[in-house]
Swiss-Prot record:
It comes from Listeria monocytogenes serovar 1/2a (strain ATCC BAA-679 / EGD-e). The lineage of its organism: Bacteria, Bacillati, Bacillota, Bacilli, Bacillales. This is Listeria nuclear targeted protein A. One of its GO terms (biological process) is symbiont-mediated suppression of host ISG15-protein conjugation. Interacts specifically with host BAHD1. Disruption phenotype: Deletion of lntA leads to a decrease in bacterial colonization of spleens and livers, as well as blood bacteraemia.
Amino acid sequence: MKKLVAWFNGLSKMWKVVVIIGAVFVVIIALTTGEDEGEQTKTKKDSNKVVKTASRPKLSTKDLALIKADLAEFEARELSSEKILKDTIKEESWSDLDFANDNINQMIGTMKRYQQEILSIDAIKRSSEASADTEAFKKIFKEWSEFKIERIQVTIDLLNGKKDSEAVFKKTYPNQIIFKKVRTNKLQTALNNLKVGYELLDSQK
Protein backbone atom coordinates (compact mmCIF):
# COMPACT_ATOMS: atom_id res chain seq x y z
CA MET A 1 0.00 0.00 0.00
CA LYS A 2 2.92 2.37 0.90
CA LYS A 3 4.57 1.59 -2.44
CA LEU A 4 1.31 2.38 -4.24
CA VAL A 5 1.02 5.73 -2.42
CA ALA A 6 4.66 6.54 -3.15
CA TRP A 7 4.12 5.64 -6.82
CA PHE A 8 1.04 7.87 -6.98
CA ASN A 9 2.85 10.81 -5.31
CA GLY A 10 5.63 10.44 -7.84
CA LEU A 11 3.29 10.98 -10.77
CA SER A 12 2.87 14.31 -12.48
CA LYS A 13 -0.29 16.32 -11.82
CA MET A 14 -1.76 15.33 -15.20
CA TRP A 15 -1.17 11.61 -14.63
CA LYS A 16 -2.66 11.82 -11.16
CA VAL A 17 -5.87 13.19 -12.70
CA VAL A 18 -5.88 10.37 -15.28
CA VAL A 19 -5.42 7.70 -12.57
CA ILE A 20 -8.20 9.19 -10.41
CA ILE A 21 -10.64 9.36 -13.35
CA GLY A 22 -9.77 5.75 -14.28
CA ALA A 23 -10.38 4.57 -10.72
CA VAL A 24 -13.78 6.31 -10.68
CA PHE A 25 -14.75 4.57 -13.94
CA VAL A 26 -13.77 1.17 -12.52
CA VAL A 27 -15.94 1.73 -9.43
CA ILE A 28 -18.92 2.86 -11.55
CA ILE A 29 -18.64 -0.18 -13.85
CA ALA A 30 -18.40 -2.53 -10.85
CA LEU A 31 -21.50 -1.02 -9.25
CA THR A 32 -23.46 -1.11 -12.52
CA THR A 33 -22.53 -4.76 -13.13
CA GLY A 34 -23.63 -5.66 -9.60
CA GLU A 35 -26.99 -3.95 -10.11
CA ASP A 36 -27.50 -5.73 -13.45
CA GLU A 37 -26.75 -9.13 -11.91
CA GLY A 38 -29.10 -8.39 -9.02
CA GLU A 39 -31.85 -7.37 -11.44
CA GLN A 40 -31.29 -10.50 -13.54
CA THR A 41 -31.52 -12.69 -10.42
CA LYS A 42 -34.73 -10.93 -9.34
CA THR A 43 -36.21 -11.27 -12.85
CA LYS A 44 -35.33 -14.97 -12.93
CA LYS A 45 -36.97 -15.55 -9.53
CA ASP A 46 -40.08 -13.65 -10.60
CA SER A 47 -40.19 -15.65 -13.83
CA ASN A 48 -39.93 -18.95 -11.94
CA LYS A 49 -42.70 -17.81 -9.63
CA VAL A 50 -44.97 -17.04 -12.59
CA VAL A 51 -44.24 -20.42 -14.21
CA LYS A 52 -44.93 -22.23 -10.94
CA THR A 53 -48.26 -20.41 -10.53
CA ALA A 54 -49.22 -21.02 -14.15
CA SER A 55 -48.53 -24.76 -13.87
CA ARG A 56 -50.81 -25.19 -10.85
CA PRO A 57 -53.09 -28.15 -11.71
CA LYS A 58 -56.79 -27.49 -12.15
CA LEU A 59 -59.74 -29.78 -12.91
CA SER A 60 -60.98 -29.12 -16.44
CA THR A 61 -64.56 -29.44 -17.69
CA LYS A 62 -63.51 -32.75 -19.24
CA ASP A 63 -62.13 -33.96 -15.88
CA LEU A 64 -65.38 -33.09 -14.09
CA ALA A 65 -67.40 -34.93 -16.75
CA LEU A 66 -65.16 -37.99 -16.33
CA ILE A 67 -65.62 -37.96 -12.54
CA LYS A 68 -69.39 -37.76 -12.99
CA ALA A 69 -69.51 -40.61 -15.52
CA ASP A 70 -67.13 -42.85 -13.55
CA LEU A 71 -69.03 -42.35 -10.31
CA ALA A 72 -72.27 -43.36 -12.05
CA GLU A 73 -70.61 -46.51 -13.42
CA PHE A 74 -68.99 -47.28 -10.05
CA GLU A 75 -72.32 -47.06 -8.21
CA ALA A 76 -74.10 -49.08 -10.91
CA ARG A 77 -71.63 -51.94 -10.37
CA GLU A 78 -72.12 -51.66 -6.63
CA LEU A 79 -75.91 -51.98 -7.02
CA SER A 80 -75.56 -54.98 -9.33
CA SER A 81 -73.16 -56.64 -6.88
CA GLU A 82 -75.52 -56.11 -3.96
CA LYS A 83 -78.43 -57.65 -5.89
CA ILE A 84 -76.38 -60.70 -6.87
CA LEU A 85 -75.18 -61.17 -3.29
CA LYS A 86 -78.68 -60.82 -1.81
CA ASP A 87 -80.18 -63.28 -4.30
CA THR A 88 -77.34 -65.74 -3.71
CA ILE A 89 -77.88 -65.55 0.05
CA LYS A 90 -81.62 -66.12 -0.53
CA GLU A 91 -80.64 -69.09 -2.73
CA GLU A 92 -82.54 -67.78 -5.72
CA SER A 93 -82.46 -70.32 -8.56
CA TRP A 94 -80.79 -67.97 -11.04
CA SER A 95 -77.91 -66.98 -8.75
CA ASP A 96 -75.77 -69.79 -7.35
CA LEU A 97 -72.33 -69.41 -5.77
CA ASP A 98 -70.41 -70.02 -9.00
CA PHE A 99 -72.46 -67.36 -10.77
CA ALA A 100 -71.92 -64.96 -7.87
CA ASN A 101 -68.16 -65.54 -7.78
CA ASP A 102 -67.72 -64.95 -11.51
CA ASN A 103 -69.85 -61.81 -11.60
CA ILE A 104 -68.75 -60.26 -8.31
CA ASN A 105 -65.08 -60.61 -9.24
CA GLN A 106 -65.81 -58.82 -12.51
CA MET A 107 -67.80 -56.12 -10.73
CA ILE A 108 -65.03 -55.50 -8.20
CA GLY A 109 -62.43 -55.33 -10.97
CA THR A 110 -64.53 -52.78 -12.85
CA MET A 111 -65.14 -50.70 -9.73
CA LYS A 112 -61.39 -50.60 -9.05
CA ARG A 113 -60.80 -49.50 -12.64
CA TYR A 114 -63.21 -46.58 -12.32
CA GLN A 115 -61.71 -45.71 -8.94
CA GLN A 116 -58.20 -45.57 -10.40
CA GLU A 117 -59.37 -43.65 -13.45
CA ILE A 118 -60.62 -40.86 -11.19
CA LEU A 119 -57.52 -40.93 -8.98
CA SER A 120 -55.30 -40.82 -12.09
CA ILE A 121 -56.66 -37.45 -13.26
CA ASP A 122 -53.65 -35.10 -13.25
CA ALA A 123 -55.15 -32.45 -10.95
CA ILE A 124 -56.20 -35.15 -8.48
CA LYS A 125 -52.83 -36.92 -8.58
CA ARG A 126 -51.21 -33.54 -7.86
CA SER A 127 -53.97 -32.44 -5.48
CA SER A 128 -51.47 -31.06 -2.94
CA GLU A 129 -50.55 -28.44 -5.57
CA ALA A 130 -54.16 -27.83 -6.58
CA SER A 131 -57.08 -26.29 -4.68
CA ALA A 132 -58.18 -27.27 -1.17
CA ASP A 133 -61.46 -28.57 -2.65
CA THR A 134 -59.56 -30.92 -4.97
CA GLU A 135 -57.42 -32.18 -2.09
CA ALA A 136 -60.52 -32.78 0.04
CA PHE A 137 -62.25 -34.65 -2.79
CA LYS A 138 -59.28 -36.96 -3.36
CA LYS A 139 -59.02 -37.90 0.31
CA ILE A 140 -62.72 -38.58 0.87
CA PHE A 141 -63.29 -40.30 -2.48
CA LYS A 142 -60.46 -42.74 -1.78
CA GLU A 143 -61.88 -43.59 1.67
CA TRP A 144 -65.45 -43.89 0.36
CA SER A 145 -64.62 -46.04 -2.69
CA GLU A 146 -62.28 -48.37 -0.77
CA PHE A 147 -64.99 -48.98 1.83
CA LYS A 148 -67.53 -49.80 -0.89
CA ILE A 149 -65.18 -52.23 -2.68
CA GLU A 150 -64.00 -53.95 0.52
CA ARG A 151 -67.58 -54.41 1.76
CA ILE A 152 -68.51 -56.34 -1.40
CA GLN A 153 -65.29 -58.37 -1.26
CA VAL A 154 -65.90 -59.36 2.36
CA THR A 155 -69.47 -60.47 1.60
CA ILE A 156 -68.43 -62.75 -1.27
CA ASP A 157 -65.58 -64.11 0.88
CA LEU A 158 -68.08 -65.01 3.60
CA LEU A 159 -70.26 -66.85 1.09
CA ASN A 160 -67.16 -68.86 0.20
CA GLY A 161 -66.49 -69.67 3.85
CA LYS A 162 -63.59 -67.22 4.24
CA LYS A 163 -64.05 -65.44 7.56
CA ASP A 164 -60.63 -63.86 8.04
CA SER A 165 -61.37 -60.88 5.81
CA GLU A 166 -64.54 -60.11 7.80
CA ALA A 167 -62.53 -59.78 11.03
CA VAL A 168 -60.11 -57.36 9.36
CA PHE A 169 -62.98 -55.40 7.83
CA LYS A 170 -64.79 -55.04 11.16
CA LYS A 171 -61.57 -53.92 12.84
CA THR A 172 -60.98 -51.31 10.13
CA TYR A 173 -64.61 -50.16 10.14
CA PRO A 174 -65.98 -50.78 13.66
CA ASN A 175 -69.14 -48.80 12.91
CA GLN A 176 -69.94 -49.30 9.24
CA ILE A 177 -73.26 -47.42 9.26
CA ILE A 178 -71.75 -44.23 10.69
CA PHE A 179 -68.64 -44.51 8.50
CA LYS A 180 -70.75 -44.89 5.37
CA LYS A 181 -73.07 -42.01 6.29
CA VAL A 182 -70.28 -39.60 7.22
CA ARG A 183 -68.17 -40.41 4.14
CA THR A 184 -71.20 -40.14 1.85
CA ASN A 185 -72.07 -36.69 3.23
CA LYS A 186 -68.46 -35.50 2.96
CA LEU A 187 -68.08 -36.82 -0.58
CA GLN A 188 -71.33 -35.20 -1.67
CA THR A 189 -70.13 -31.89 -0.22
CA ALA A 190 -66.80 -32.27 -2.06
CA LEU A 191 -68.62 -33.00 -5.33
CA ASN A 192 -70.83 -29.95 -4.85
CA ASN A 193 -67.82 -27.73 -4.11
CA LEU A 194 -66.13 -28.88 -7.32
CA LYS A 195 -69.42 -28.42 -9.23
CA VAL A 196 -69.33 -31.98 -10.62
CA GLY A 197 -73.13 -32.08 -10.87
CA TYR A 198 -73.56 -35.59 -9.52
CA GLU A 199 -75.72 -36.81 -6.63
CA LEU A 200 -74.62 -40.01 -4.93
CA LEU A 201 -77.25 -42.74 -4.68
CA ASP A 202 -76.93 -42.83 -0.89
CA SER A 203 -77.51 -39.07 -0.81
CA GLN A 204 -80.83 -39.57 -2.61
CA LYS A 205 -82.21 -41.87 0.09
